[in-house]
Amino acid sequence: MQHPGHLIRLALSLPPHIALAKAARFARRLADRRIRGWLYRDRCSYPQSPGRLRRSLDALDVSIPDSFGETRLLFEHRFDLLGSGPVRVAHGERYKGFGPHRYGPSPPLPADWRDAVTAELSPGNRKRARTILDQIPGGYTPIDWHVDFVSGFRWSPATWGGGIAYAHLPGVDIKLPWELARMQHLPRLALLADAGTLPALAAEFRAQALDFMGSNPPGWGVNWACAMDVAIRAANLILAWELFRARGATFDEAFEDELAASLLAHGRHVMANLEWSERHRGNHYLADVCGLAAIAHALPDSPESAEWRSFATTELNAEILRQFTPDGANFEASTAYHRLSAEMAMVTAALLLGRGESLSDEALARLAAAVRFAAHVTKPSGEMVQIGDNDSGRFVRLETEDRPLDMAPLIAAAKGLFDLDLPVPADTLSVTRVVAALAGGRRFPAPPPVRRPLPTGPVENSPCLRLRIMPPAPAALTGLEAVAYPDFGLFLWRGPRAFIALRCGPIGQNGQGGHAHNDQLAVEIEIDGVAWTRDPGSFVYTADLAERDCYRSVMAHFAPRRGSGEPARLLAPFRLEDRAGAKLVRFGDDMVGRHVGFGSPVQRRVAIEDGAIVIEDTPGEGEHVLRSPEDLARLWGLILPFSPGYGRKG
């Protein structure tokens, strides 16, 4: 059922031509759902097994400690994803809801749950699905893979994946089932195992994989709606199987046949639904390529898998150079999406190189530069500066502890492939060892960074609003290193005790701005572990479009203001007007940037003078001395709760 009020609010937030285009796409999706569902409902979409899978990892003794009872939670099917909190995901559960919006629950399953699960599926898939589910031993409680386990809304598994509705009801977030079905918890099961628990954890991996395969026929349901998520799921299924085998676990032939058949279905689905665009392809297409690389090297050799191997290697080379700018930053104007895309490229590069494929020297140098960017945007507290959107997306999760604003797992992955003198926490050693094993021991030098000359032009000396930010310990502001990323639009002063960042540059995605915020000339400051001002994050996407725009607004950022006006229109939930045209004027002893988003030029200058951070906004008037983060927040009206990750506040 569509919710007219939610759809009307969405339409009214868009320019007429975009609203009409979206309405047309929505109508086509509804038609596609009905037509394909009718055409394919009596067909079986499961392929036959292509044969035994090929291994990339030999014996590997690597593990992570169970420091917070994660093993028990995974056995109980309790997941903490995208702000859900630890919640049991099962049929018939009632969930907390998103704000006032709460759906469900769906009916609980009877004792003979296999019949109930297969009865929901398209008729042509029921027989094969039942064969798969029958391989799961008694005592297992199935996961409900089709539910948003915050709002409680549930998608029908009998709906053709390409016609799945999303952003259609208030509070409903399709990212919840997608995140769970990425299966990033399954490699963790393998790493959590020790000699005594390995058989039980391997059995749980087998049961969950079969549960998913039997409950999600290829092409049907919410978990086949987005090729990116299909690709990431395949990579994690393969990695989990590899890690269990490398640690000594064995699996029966029937299961391995089903796993191989499922991976073949994943590969065919991704190839048939590549998220390619001449101008605006980004992390989704990169994920497609990386998932295909993993699938192609796991499947038995055949003309089909050979074609995928060649395609994935060629495209990974090309997309690294396209999606990472010459200074190493990702082109989507988001530090969180930089982490995701760099992690996908890094792990896949290791896999390909370990299997005898080649990447260009230029692509490898670009990856090494991407890791330096990750290190440089990390504040002394260990958290990355949030620029642009943050959906907490990852490719794999192999570290001991999940810290939502942590670049360390990416840096640790790179240390498995490159000779890098970058520190990482000890609890990320597992990441380095797995990536090094995937690379087959191949290592590469990290070329020195490329430094480009930056502008040193004159600044406008007109009346300005002047702020003096006075930290308790002025010495924290001494000895700062200046680091510039002009292609991304981020300029930094970094030291062991202080971090100051100025956002000034492109909105990303070749002007689409799909993951950018109205943050031009925004400043972020951390001193002695205290955030004096910081980007508030993103919170959510389609579950609450009004909240999304609040977090994208200039009013959420410590940036120059003109009343409550926006320097660029929020054209759509994933599109920002390319109007501000922010340009760096000078970077060195001070940082000066300018934009024209309000019609006439706005300039911001940042300097360190006499133990204080001085910020001057032109045009403007007045002077304020700020002695605490609270003073700054009150002056600028920064009231949005901080969101450290998707779906989280505070």
Q: Which positions does each model-derived feature cover?
A:
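Compositionally biased, charge-rich terminal segments
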Residues: 1-18
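Beta-strand-rich N-terminal accessory domains
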Residues: 10, 14, 22, 26, ...
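Extended, charge-enriched "interface" segments that sit outside catalytic cores
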Residues: 30, 34-168, 175-179
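Short polybasic amphipathic segments
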Residues: 134, 491, 523-525, 617, ...
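Aromatic-lined, polymer-binding surfaces characteristic
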Residues: 135, 154-159, 163-167, 171-372, ...
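Short, flexible loop/turn elements at secondary-structure junctions
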Residues: 149, 184-187, 495-497, 506, ...
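CBM-like, beta-strand-rich accessory domains located in the C-terminal region of large
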Residues: 231, 390-391, 397-403, 420-428, ...
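Carbohydrate-active enzyme catalytic cores, enriched for enzymes
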Residues: 329, 333-532, 586-590
